[in-house]
Amino acid sequence: MINEIQIAAFNAAYAKTIDSDAMEQWPTFFTKDCHYCVTNVDNHDEGLAAGIVWADSQDMLTDRISALREANIYERHRYRHILGLPSIQSGDATQASASTPFMVLRIMHTGETEVFASGEYLDKFTTIDGKLRLQERIAVCDSTVTDTLMALPL
């Protein structure tokens, strides 16, 4: 059985990858045919599929990081994830559906720190070669207001 400890460890490694700017590793947390979406609670509750960020493959996630590194121009900043404990809704030895609350602080190059996003990850995990991978991650943000500077993944 996939358990909460495995998912919590996975989420900690996921957050550390983003927070430490090891972005090129971020897509490896997902399956090849994954779905990743950042949306808000109102859109999610209404069943609206479109999100602020939307990708339907690991290749799209890799392209997002390439654009972040090579093409996009944005004010230098970094994130710090604060994660709650995961709750498994269903699962077996190779798959699990879980939710995990999150808060992301954004630290600007000036040192200014603010709450950038809070919400809940809605995840579908699978195992590949004995390792957890995300088949789907929907980051449902509590606020309907999103800063246009969402360059880094949640």
Swiss-Prot record:
Gene Ontology biological-process entries: phthalate metabolic process
InterPro entries: NTF2-like_dom_sf, Rng_hydr_dOase-bsu
pH effects: Optimum pH is 7. About 20% of maximum TPADO activity is observed at pH 9, whereas no activity is observed at pH 5.
Highest taxon listed in the record's lineage: Bacteria
Cofactor(s) this protein requires: Fe cation
Pfam families reported for this sequence: Ring_hydroxyl_B
Keyword match Transferase: no
Keywords: Dioxygenase, NAD, Oxidoreductase
A single MF term (Gene Ontology): iron ion binding
Dependence of activity on temperature: Optimum temperature is 30 degrees Celsius. Approximately 60% of maximum TPADO activity is observed at 15 degrees Celsius, and activity is completely lost at 50 degrees Celsius.
Assigned EC number: 1.14.12.15
Catalysed reactions, as listed in the record: terephthalate + NADH + O2 + H(+) = (3S,4R)-3,4-dihydroxycyclohexa-1,5-diene-1,4-dicarboxylate + NAD(+)
Activity regulation annotation text: Inhibited by EDTA.
Subunit and interaction comment: Heterotetramer composed of 2 alpha (TphA2I and TphA2II) and 2 beta (TphA3I and TphA3II) subunits. Part of a multicomponent enzyme system composed of a reductase (TphA1I or TphA1II) and a two-subunit oxygenase component (TphA2I or TphA2II and TphA3I or TphA3II).
Task of the protein: Component of the terephthalate 1,2-dioxygenase multicomponent enzyme system which catalyzes the dioxygenation of terephthalate (TER/TPA) to 1,2-dihydroxy-3,5-cyclohexadiene-1,4-dicarboxylic acid (DCD). It can also use 2,5-dicarboxypyridine (PDC) and 1,4-napthalenedicarboxylic acid (NDC) as substrates, and preferentially uses NADPH which is the physiological electron donor.
Similarity comment: Belongs to the bacterial ring-hydroxylating dioxygenase beta subunit family.
Record protein name field: Terephthalate 1,2-dioxygenase, terminal oxygenase component subunit beta 2
Organism: Comamonas sp
